[in-house]
Amino acid sequence: TDAXNPPEGPQDRGSQQKGRLSLQNTAEIQHCLVNAGDVGCGVFECFENNXCXIXXLHXISFIKAHALRFGCISREMVFQLQRECYLKHDLCMINFRDLLLHEPYVDLVNLLLTCGEDVKEAVTRSIQAQCEQNWGGLCSILSFCTSNVQRPXAXQPXADRAQVSRPHHHDTGHHLLEAIXGAKGERGSKSHPSVRA
């Protein structure tokens, strides 16, 4: 193969890697991560997300859902670069409809809640705004529907609660409601969090 030949540029690298990268081949994943030019969003060209567009995040979260196939070093690199990518793009827009359709996407959003307060607040604002825009008053009912679920988990730190909620097909909706309701509760308790420029 031509895997040993260095590509001419980032776009060429993205198109070449996209066709031959296998999630099951740790060596290819490590090669992709090590040889990606810029540290940041460009790395995800390797993972069929060459624009770092938010609509393709479920493809990245699919990789995270199979992270046990990675070595520890590769997994940590993916986490670090993914976080840097989201911070660079200010999480642009989380696609609310993808939360309803893609289980790995929901898993990813739950994991994002563990990435520090800045990221958590950005995710919360984005989900809350779209929830209200799409569902209106129904969005406020979600906190009522999940209040019994949240009480036992309230003793856990928010990061632990989000980390535990890796959804399966039958409870994806449950964890999504928990994430949205938790976002509403936190937003209500803080009233107006400090705005960071």
From Swiss-Prot:
Keyword Disulfide bond: yes
Region annotation (Disordered) ranges: 1-20
Keywords: Disulfide bond, Hormone, Secreted
Positions of disulphide bridges: none
One GO BP annotation of this record: intracellular calcium ion homeostasis
Entry's Gene Ontology molecular function annotations: hormone activity
Main location: secreted
Pfam families found in the cross-reference section: Stanniocalcin (PF03298)
Listed GO CC annotations: extracellular space
Purpose of the protein: Has an anti-hypocalcemic action on calcium and phosphate homeostasis.
Family, as annotated: Belongs to the stanniocalcin family.
Alphabetized PANTHER family for the sequence: STANNIOCALCIN (PTHR11245), STANNIOCALCIN-2 (PTHR11245:SF2)
Complexes and interactors: Homodimer; disulfide-linked.
Protein name (record): Stanniocalcin-2
Natural source organism: Cavia porcellus (Guinea pig)
